[in-house]
């Protein structure tokens, strides 16, 4: 966050400053527990909780001011629409920094967060980098990330998600990216969009939102993504296994823990890369990150060096040894059919004893939800010795898995069952949509 006085913030967002004059020097937060000294607490009045009631707690944590819809115990900028004010403030801050800043937007049906993490690791070696924390990729998370940018920031990496057409266009209206990375068009949020064509149109909004002359970085393996090249007059870089992708993935080999080594090849050079991440799909994510880095001026050799030590956000393909001698693969943050298949492929590639897939409901799949769950269940049964379906909503997974399935009522029952049945050498995958909270199962085993 660049230093801004309370009155200046009020002027930027069209609000009224109340309380003593203070200067905000630290990032904005929505959670009072995450406030930092000198920070701005953004208070929303929701149906079940009113953020304004937590202003004092935010102050104790170090926040010096509040952006809200009514005065609080802290100096406050009062506005009619807090969301719009937050977005306006973020757009203003980035506009002031824009001359020295390269903005990268990342979207796709799956792999956004992992690719964003890889790209941030690469760009951090080339200059001060601010990137989305976790999956804060919506109309609130993106401006919060933008407000973390400072005068010294050289790269701003923004994960951009969507549940409806127009969502990403709204985000690029706040900050037009210099580089737009589109990973894939899958079935995540199909229930909200209604069709893959609608999902493709939504993801394409990132390309359409590029600054004039900005670079689109597109997956050559996904025809829906590759066709987005017509949405821009600027340069296009491609990545993938397809020949001739601009950054091509070749010779993928997995070690005993399912971690890929591969060659990334461009027209000018190539580099061998060993990723410290689980899953063959990480090689494709790495090629996307390398292509985006090339667009940002980072050469392939520096990108691959950085990728060898990259790490992912929590609860994403985390490998951990358990006290019982089993191995936990925690990918519990979120799930859709495509990402679950990738995780199951990773599970099957890890050497060990039995492979146990603990799966929960995949949300927002619309009318095809039951069929998608059955199909993933069958896919799991071909790659795991036991498929544990957690919760009644996950029963179609068990139906698809057939005789390999175990159905358990909830997370506590899953923890109890696993504690009773896990043995040394077993490998257990935990994965579901965020709403299923299967991170509780992973935590219960750790």
From Swiss-Prot:
Annotated residues for binding of ATP: 108-114
**Which top-level enzyme class is recorded in the Swiss-Prot or TrEMBL entry?**
ligase
Q: Which GO terms describe its molecular function?
A: ATP binding; UDP-N-acetylmuramoyl-tripeptide-D-alanyl-D-alanine ligase activity; UDP-N-acetylmuramoylalanyl-D-glutamyl-2,6-diaminopimelate-D-alanyl-D-alanine ligase activity
| Annotated compartments | Cytoplasm
Enumerate the Gene3D superfamilies for this protein.
Mur ligase, C-terminal domain, Mur-like, catalytic domain, MurE/MurF, N-terminal domain
Which InterPro entries does the UniProt record give?
A: Mur-like_cat_sf (IPR036565), Mur_ligase_C (IPR004101), Mur_ligase_C_dom_sf (IPR036615), Mur_ligase_cen (IPR013221), Mur_ligase_N (IPR000713), MurCDEF_CellWall_CoF430Synth (IPR051046), MurE/MurF_N (IPR035911), UDP-N-AcMur_synth (IPR005863)
Where primarily located?
A: cytoplasm
- GO cellular component assignments: cytoplasm
UniProt GO BP:
cell division; cell wall organization; peptidoglycan biosynthetic process; regulation of cell shape
Which reaction is the catalytic activity of this chain?
A: D-alanyl-D-alanine + UDP-N-acetyl-alpha-D-muramoyl-L-alanyl-gamma-D-glutamyl-meso-2,6-diaminopimelate + ATP = UDP-N-acetyl-alpha-D-muramoyl-L-alanyl-gamma-D-glutamyl-meso-2,6-diaminopimeloyl-D-alanyl-D-alanine + ADP + phosphate + H(+)
Which domain of life, per UniProt?
Bacteria
Question: HAMAP family, from UniProt?
Answer: MurF (MF_02019)
Its protein name is UDP-N-acetylmuramoyl-tripeptide--D-alanyl-D-alanine ligase
């Amino acid at each position: 966050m660049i230093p801004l006085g309370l009155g200046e913030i009020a002027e930027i967002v069209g609000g009224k400053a109340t309380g003593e004059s203070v200067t905000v020097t630290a990032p904005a937060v929505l959670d009072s527990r995450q406030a930092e000294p000198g920070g701005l607490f953004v208070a929303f009045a929701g149906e079940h909780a009113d953020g304004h009631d937590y202003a004092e707690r935010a102050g104790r944590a170090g926040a010096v001011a509040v952006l809200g819809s009514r005065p609080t115990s802290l100096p406050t900028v009062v506005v009619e629409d807090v969301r719009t004010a937050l977005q306006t403030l973020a757009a203003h801050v980035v506009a002031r920094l824009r001359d020295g800043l390269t903005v990268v937007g990342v979207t796709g049906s799956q792999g956004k967060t992992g690719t964003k993490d890889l790209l941030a690791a690469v760009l951090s070696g080339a200059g001060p980098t601010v990137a989305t924390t976790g999956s804060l990729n919506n109309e609130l998370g993106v401006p919060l990330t933008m407000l973390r940018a400072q005068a010294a920031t050289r790269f701003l990496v923004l994960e951009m998600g969507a549940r409806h057409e127009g969502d990403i266009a709204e985000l690029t209206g706040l900050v037009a990216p210099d580089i737009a990375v589109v990973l894939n068009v899958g079935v995540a949020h199909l229930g909200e969009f209604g069709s893959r064509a609608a999902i493709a149109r939504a993801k394409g909004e990132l390309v359409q939102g590029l600054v004039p002359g900005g670079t689109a970085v597109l997956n050559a393996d996904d025809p829906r993504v590759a066709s987005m090249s017509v949405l821009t007059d600027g340069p296009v870089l491609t990545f993938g296994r397809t020949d001739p992708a601009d950054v091509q993935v070749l010779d993928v080999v997995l070690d005993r823990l399912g971690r890929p080594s591969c060659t990334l090849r461009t027209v000018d050079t190539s580099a061998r890369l060993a990723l410290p991440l689980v899953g063959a799909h990480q090689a494709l994510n790495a090629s996307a990150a390398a292509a985006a880095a090339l667009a940002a001026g980072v050469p392939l050799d520096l990108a691959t060096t950085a990728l060898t030590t990259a790490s992912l956000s929590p609860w994403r393909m985390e490998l951990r040894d358990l006290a019982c001698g089993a191995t936990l693969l925690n990918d519990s943050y979120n799930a859709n059919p495509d990402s679950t298949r990738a995780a199951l492929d990773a599970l099957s590639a890890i050497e060990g004893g039995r492979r146990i897939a603990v799966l929960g409901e995949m949300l927002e799949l619309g009318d095809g939800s039951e069929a998608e769950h059955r199909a993933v269940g069958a896919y799991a049964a071909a790659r795991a010795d036991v498929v544990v379906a957690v919760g009644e909503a996950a029963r179609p997974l068990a139906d698809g898995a057939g005789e390999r399935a175990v159905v358990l009522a909830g997370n506590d029952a899953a923890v109890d069952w696993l504690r009773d049945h896990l043995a040394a050498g077993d490998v257990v995958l935990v994965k579901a949509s965020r709403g299923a909270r299967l991170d509780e199962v992973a935590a219960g085993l750790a």
